[in-house]
Structures are given as C-alpha cells and as structure tokens.
Amino acid sequence: MNLLDPFMKMTEEQDKCMSGAPSPTMSDDSAGSPCPSGSGSDTENTRPQENTFPKGDQELKKETEDEKFPVCIREAVSQVLKGYDWTLVPMPVRVNGSSKNKPHVKRPMNAFMVWAQAARRKLADQYPHLHNAELSKTLGKLWRLLNEGEKRPFVEEAERLRVQHKKDHPDYKYQPRRRKSVKNGQTEQEDGAEQTHISPNAIFKALQADSPHSSSSMSEVHSPGEHSGQSQGPPTPPTTPKTDIQPGKPDLKREGRPLQENGRQPPHIDFRDVDIGELSSEVISTIETFDVNEFDQYLPPNGHPGVGSTQASYTGSYGISSTPSATTGAGPAWMSKQQQQQPQQHSLSTLNSEQSQSQQRTHIKTEQLSPSHYSDQQQQHSPQQLNYSSFNLQHYSSSYPTITRAQYDYTEHQGSSTYYSHASGQNSGLYSTFSYMNPSQRPLYTPIADTTGVPSIPQTHSPQHWEQPVYTQLTRP
C-alpha cells in the first residue's frame, strides 16, 4: 500500500539518524496497529501518530506524543511526509450512498473505543509483538471488568467527542454498510437444511423459513436451545429432524406413496438415491400386503421388454407374502415385475407366472386362486389353468415353509436347461416361489431366457416354462 512507503523510508532515515531504539515501536504504532475509529485521516496532519487519538484529546497526550520520539525522528518524519504527494493516495470511499466524491466521515468513538484506542497505543509501545486481535479481545474483557467509576472518564470523553462531532458534521447520518455476506450465509444454511437433514441449527432455521405458512408465531424459534417453538409449529412441518424421519421412512414406503404428496413439501428424499436395502427384512416382514402398483412409477418404464403390455392383467395379484419371508428368514418375495416380463415369451409363459404366483399366495389369500382371478387368460387355457391352481394348493403347501436359504442359491446352474428338466417335479415350485430375494442377494439374479428343451416336460407333472420367471432386480429409476 502506498501509505506504508513513507514509513519504510522513515525507518531508514531513523537508522541513519541516531537512535534505533524507538524505531520498532514507532513503526509498529503507525503501520501495525490499526485504529479503526480514529477520527480524521492522515491527509490532515504531517504527524500520523497524532491522528489515532481524537482531535480534541487531552493536551497532555499530545505532549507525551511529541516527547516520545527524539527531534531527529520527528524531523525525518516531516521531511518524508513533505516530499510525498498525498493527493495520490486513494481515499477510502464507501460504494453505497451518494457520498462517492466526499471523504468518509467516521462515527464518533464511544466510551469503549476511547478506552481501547488509548490502551492499545500504550500496550503496543510496551509489547510491540502483541497480536492485534488478541489485544482487542483482552481489552474487551478488561472493559467489562471495569466498574462505573473507572469507566466514567472514558464515558465523558466519548460524550464530548459526540458533541464535537455533531458540531463538525451537523448533517451527519450513520449509514452502516449492509452485511450481504452474512445474509447469504444464512440462506445457504437454510437451503442446506431443506435438502439434507444435518444439524439441529439448520433444522430450526428451516422451521423459521417456513414460519409464514404456519398459523402460530414462530418468533420464539431463535436457537436450537429453545424448544418452545417446536410445539407451536405447524402440525406437519415440511422439514423434520433426521431422528424423526428415519422411523418415518418405512411408513412412507409402506403406504407406497412418495413424500412429495404432502402439499408444498420440498424434495427431501430423492428416490433415485434411496436403496431398497434400507428396508431391512424385519421391516418388510411386518408389512401387510399392499398394492405394489404405486411402486411401478419408480421403476424404469422401458427397462424390460413387454412390461407395459399386460401390466393391467396382473395388478390384482401383486403383493408381498409375509409368510415366506418369515419362515425362510430371507427377504420378501417381491412379485412386482416378474409377472410383467413373461408375456414376451409365448402364451403359456403367462400360465406359469399365474401358477407360481398362485402357489406363492397360498398362505395369504386363497381367494386369489379362484378361477375368477384368471379371467384374462381363461379364454385361452381354461382347462389347464384350473388344473394348475388346485395342483399348487395340494402340491406346494406342504413343502413350501421348509425352504432354507441354501436351497435357492442356485445361480451357477442357471444356464443349463438339463438341470431344470430333471428337477422339474417339486423344485419348480420351490424356485419360482422366491422371485425376489433379500437385498444381499439381489445382484445374483439375471434373466433366464433359456427355453430349450422345455416343451418336453410333461404338462401334468410341472407347468411349462417353469424356469421362465425372470429374476429381476429392482433398479433405481
């Protein structure tokens, strides 16, 4: 900065002159110790040291100022300052306001500033290496410890300065600069609170941000320490703390509806980021059968061929069977997309999906095995259909609960149709039961499209295409 150049020259001349002892303190005073509220600028005086004190300060202080430095140093300072063109120094200008061409008029110092300036000057002389911020903190602590009697001279001096300032600048009006940065920080924190439920601070700020919508006054909600505002808030505030949302997450999924249905709710949970692994098997085993149809809006529409063609014909039989997941200890048997994929094969494959589905529901809804459920396909294969449904009830219900995890880890055999054809009797029902394994096994299952050799299987022994149910992964949309 240009202002420091004269002081650098000044210190050089002091070294030439005589005593180097006062020079560090003087250069520290003039350059190092910022006195923010000193009245007046360096342009008005040839000695900048005097300007850190108020104009009409005690004469005693000015005398001590003059006595502080030897005559040689004072002459060197005045010589340097004379040789410098002070009109070249840019004046500090406040951008907002019409006073761009006028020099900035500082506020009159209050009592604490009078004390801090005088004490800072004294301490900076004695301890030139004190950090200015630490010095300010210490001065503030000391000021709070002073009693009224000790503060009185500073209060009187501040009052005198205020009166003098009013005389000098009768039309002075204090116009503080608006702190845009702080407000931006607050709004950023509020935005962050609406997107990620991180800190209670951010949650309370978000509650404050939503307070115009609530009927009660949220003015009490200033800090997370005051919980009075929490009880007075809206009955279902859009941003709830994370501790509330985690038990709530399975509930929202249990109802099968997105979070965004609650009116003006900000998008807290992006379903693309939600792993179904969060729903543990215990949670899903407690879920009653519900319509998985609403989940299909989160599944990729074009992910598998033939999904949309017969979607309507299977909606009645979707569901999660809680009995198999309870007996096997494995994850739920999700049926949502298995049936939708089979129409891409020929028409008998739909029979198998109905068959496997009906045997899957034997413990839960036996009314779904009635012929009325299969009305869509009954025109084509009505004799076989009734045969299969009764066959499922008597054939699979005995062996169904005894399945263990080891029985369906069969992914290494997926390619060979010979394995399936000789095991066609009972295993067909066992394997088609678990169309959706628990989350840890999800990546193992790939679509089985190998239909070779299947028509040779006898119809009465097992349904055609029994390896046809495609084991799908519920991928994120």
Swiss-Prot record:
Biological process GO terms, please?
cartilage development; chondrocyte differentiation; gonadal mesoderm development; growth plate cartilage chondrocyte growth; heart development; morphogenesis of an epithelium; negative regulation of canonical Wnt signaling pathway; negative regulation of fatty acid oxidation
Region labeled Transactivation domain (TAM) — which residues? 224-308
Keywords, alphabetical? Activator, Chondrogenesis, Cytoplasm, Developmental protein, Differentiation, DNA-binding, Gonadal differentiation, Isopeptide bond, Nucleus, Transcription, Transcription regulation, Ubl conjugation
Give any GO molecular function from the UniProt entry: DNA-binding transcription factor activity, RNA polymerase II-specific
Q: What is its main location?
A: nucleus
Q: Which Pfam families match?
A: HMG_box (PF00505), Sox_N (PF12444)
Q: Where in the sequence does UniProt note compositional bias of the Polar residues kind? A: 308-328, 346-361, 453-477
* SUPFAM superfamilies assigned to the protein according to its UniProt record, in alphabetical order: HMG-box
- Domain remarks in the Swiss-Prot or TrEMBL record: The 9aaTAD motif is a transactivation domain present in a large number of yeast and animal transcription factors.
Q: Which protein are we looking at? A: Transcription factor Sox-9-A
Per the UniProt entry, what species is this protein from, by scientific name? Xenopus laevis (African clawed frog)
Q: What is the lineage of its organism?
A: Eukaryota, Metazoa, Chordata, Craniata, Vertebrata
